[in-house]
C-alpha cells in the first residue's frame, strides 16, 4: 500500500471502486466443486475499506457502480446501514452486480472465480461521478481493479485527478487479482506506476528493504508492505522499520488488508503529522495490524470488520 498527498485536516475518507457479493464455502480446504454450500457475504476491497472506517468511528463515502438488481440494492443498503455515505453510488440497468466465488484453503488463504463480464462496476463513466463528493474528500482511497477496462478506467483517473486537485491525501492498495487482467504484463503496466505489491512488481520472493525501496518515488509519504500475521514493514522519507502482527485463529483472510487500510486511514485523516513521527506511526500501524488480525477470525470481509473496542482488547492482550 502507498500513501501520498498534501496536508489535510479532519474530514471525509472517500473510497472508489468495486463492491460485490463474495460466495465463501461453508467449509475450508475444499475446491469450489467440492463445497457443500456457500455463505453469501458482501465484499469488494474499496467498499470494505469504507465500512472499516465507519466501524472504527470514522467518516467515509463510497463511489462506484452497482447493478440495478436485488444484490446491488442490498449492497447499497449495507453501506448505508454501516454509516457510509452513498451519494456516489450509481446503478446500471443493463449489467449485473459482480459476484466472486472464493475458495478457502485449509490455512484460510483464498483463490477466486469471478462473474463480471461485464459487471456494473466496470461500466462507471466519468460523467456519472459525483465530483462534489470527491472534492470534499480529505483522503481518496482506491485499488487497481477499476483500472482494468474502460469506461471505468477513465472514471477512476478522472476521480483521482479531481481529488488530487482538491488537496486530498491519495491512498492506494493494489488488491491484485490476476484472473481479472488480460495478462500479468498488463497488470504490471497499470500498477508499476502507482507502487504496488512487492513480490509481483519485483519478480522476487525476497521481502527486504532494497526490494521495497525500489518502489519508492519522491511524492510518496508512506509505503507499506503488509506481511500477514507477521505485521508490516513501513517506509517514509525519513525512516523505515517494522511492526509485529498478532497470532489469531485464522478462518478467512478475506478483507484483512482492507481492515488494516481502513484503520490506518481513520487514524491519519485527523492528523497527517503522524506520518512524520515514527513512534506515533508505529502505534497506528500496530492498531491497524490488530484490526486486520481480527478480520481473519470470521468468514467474509464486512461481517468480520472490527470496532475500535475490539481492536483495543486485542492490543491489550498482546501478540
Curated annotation (Swiss-Prot):
Q: Which residues form a coiled coil?
A: none
Gene Ontology terms for molecular function: ATP binding; fructokinase activity
Q: From the UniProt record, list the reaction(s) this protein catalyses.
A: D-fructose + ATP = D-fructose 6-phosphate + ADP + H(+)
Q: What does the tissue specificity note say? A: Expressed in swelling stolons and, at higher levels, in developing tubers. Low levels found in leaves and stems from tuberizing plants.
- What keywords sit in the KW lines? ATP-binding, Carbohydrate metabolism, Kinase, Nucleotide-binding, Transferase
Entry keyword RNA-binding = no
Annotated family: Belongs to the carbohydrate kinase PfkB family.
Instruction: Tell me which PANTHER family the record gives.
Output: FRUCTOKINASE-4-RELATED, HEXOKINASE FAMILY MEMBER
Protein name according to UniProt: Fructokinase
Amino acid at each position: 500500500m502507498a500513501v501520498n498527498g498534501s496536508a489535510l485536516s479532519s474530514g471525509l475518507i472517500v473510497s472508489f471502486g468495486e463492491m460485490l457479493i463474495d460466495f465463501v464455502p461453508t467449509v475450508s480446504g475444499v475446491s469450489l466443486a467440492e463445497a457443500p454450500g456457500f455463505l453469501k457475504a458482501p465484499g469488494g476491497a474499496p467498499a470494505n475499506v469504507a465500512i472499516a472506517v465507519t466501524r472504527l468511528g470514522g467518516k467515509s463515502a463510497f463511489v462506484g457502480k452497482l447493478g440495478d438488481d436485488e444484490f446491488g440494492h442490498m449492497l447499497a443498503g449495507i453501506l448505508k446501514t454501516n454509516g457510509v455515505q452513498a451519494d456516489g453510488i450509481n446503478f446500471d440497468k443493463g449489467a449485473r452486480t459482480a459476484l466472486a466465488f472464493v475458495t478457502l484453503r485449509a490455512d484460510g488463504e483464498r483463490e477466486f472465480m469471478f462473474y463480471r463480464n461485464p459487471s456494473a462496476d466496470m461500466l462507471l463513466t466519468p460523467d456519472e461521478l459525483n465530483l462534489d463528493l470527491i472534492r470534499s474528500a480529505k483522503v481518496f482511497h482506491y485499488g487497481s481493479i477499476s483500472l482494468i477496462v474502460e469506461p471505468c478506467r477513465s472514471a477512476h483517473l478522472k476521480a483521482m485527478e479531481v481529488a488530487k486537485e482538491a488537496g486530498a491525501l491519495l491512498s492506494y492498495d493494489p488488491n491484485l487479482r490476476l484472473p481479472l487482467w488480460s495478462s500479468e504484463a498488463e497488470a504490471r503496466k497499470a500498477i508499476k506506476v502507482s507502487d504496488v505489491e512487492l513480490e509481483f512488481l519485483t519478480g522476487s520472493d525476497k521481502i527486504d528493504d532494497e526490494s521495497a525501496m525500489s518502489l519508492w518515488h519522491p511524492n510518496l509519504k508512506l509505503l507499506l508492505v503488509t506481511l500477514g500475521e507477521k505485521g508490516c514493514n513501513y517506509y517514509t522519507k525519513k525512516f523505515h522499520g517494522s511492526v509485529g502482527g498478532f497470532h489469531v485463529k485464522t478462518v478467512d483472510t478475506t478483507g484483512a488488508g482492507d481492515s488494516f487500510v481502513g484503520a490506518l486511514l481513520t487514524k491519519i485523516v485527523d492528523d497527517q503529522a503522524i506520518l512524520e513521527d515514527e513512534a506515533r506511526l508505529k502505534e497506528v500501524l500496530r492498531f491497524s495490524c490488530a484490526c486486520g488480525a481480527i478480520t481473519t477470525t470470521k468468514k467474509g470481509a464486512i461481517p468480520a470488520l472490527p470496532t475500535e473496542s475490539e481492536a483495543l482488547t486485542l492490543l491489550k492482550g498482546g501478540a
